[in-house]
C-alpha cells in the first residue's frame, strides 16, 4: 500500500482580484471560490461580503481537514467512528495585517473542538489523537509557525 502513495502531491489555486477586497479563486480541482471582506471591516480594503475572508478559508480548510485525517487513521486502525464534528477558531492580530510595527500577522492561536461519536475505548481514542497530531497537514503548518494549538476533544458514546 505505501508503494501506491506518491512522495509529492501538489494543489494549486489562482486568485483573480476583482476590486475592493474581492477575489475569484480557481482551484486545480475545477472548483471556483470567492473571497471577500465584510463591508466596513475595520482596517479592511472595502469588501462587499461576497464570500469568506482569506482567514475564514484557513479556518474552514483546517476544520475540513480534521475529519478527513481522523477517518483515514481510524480506517487504517479498524476504529469505527460513527460521527466526527470539528469546529475551528483561528485568532490573529489584524493590526499585523494593517502593517503596524507592534503586531504580527501570523495566527497566534488555533482552537479546535473535536467531537467523536464512537464506541472505541479511551486508549484507542488517545492513539488516534496522537496519530492525528503527527499527520494532519494544517495542524502541523499552524503549530510549526508558532501558533498556539488548543484542542478540546469530546467523545460521545454511540
Regions found by a protein language model. Give the residues of each.
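Extended beta-strand/beta-hairpin segments
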Residues: 1-60, 72-158
Amino acid at each position: 500500500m505505501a508503494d501506491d502513495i506518491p512522495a509529492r502531491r501538489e494543489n494549486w489555486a489562482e486568485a483573480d482580484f476583482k476590486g475592493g477586497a474581492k477575489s475569484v479563486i480557481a482551484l486545480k480541482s475545477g472548483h471556483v471560490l470567492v473571497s471577500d471582506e465584510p463591508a466596513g471591516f475595520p482596517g479592511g480594503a472595502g469588501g462587499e461580503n461576497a464570500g469568506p475572508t482569506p482567514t475564514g478559508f484557513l479556518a474552514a480548510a483546517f476544520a475540513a481537514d480534521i475529519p478527513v485525517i481522523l477517518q483515514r487513521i481510524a480506517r487504517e486502525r479498524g476504529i469505527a467512528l460513527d460521527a466526527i464534528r470539528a469546529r475551528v477558531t483561528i485568532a490573529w492580530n489584524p493590526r499585523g495585517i494593517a502593517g503596524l510595527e507592534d503586531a504580527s500577522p501570523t495566527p497566534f492561536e488555533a482552537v479546535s473542538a473535536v467531537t467523536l461519536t464512537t464506541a472505541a475505548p479511551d486508549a484507542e481514542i488517545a492513539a488516534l489523537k496522537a496519530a492525528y497530531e503527527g499527520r494532519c497537514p494544517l495542524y502541523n503548518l499552524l503549530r510549526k509557525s508558532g501558533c498556539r494549538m488548543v484542542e478540546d476533544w469530546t467523545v460521545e458514546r454511540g
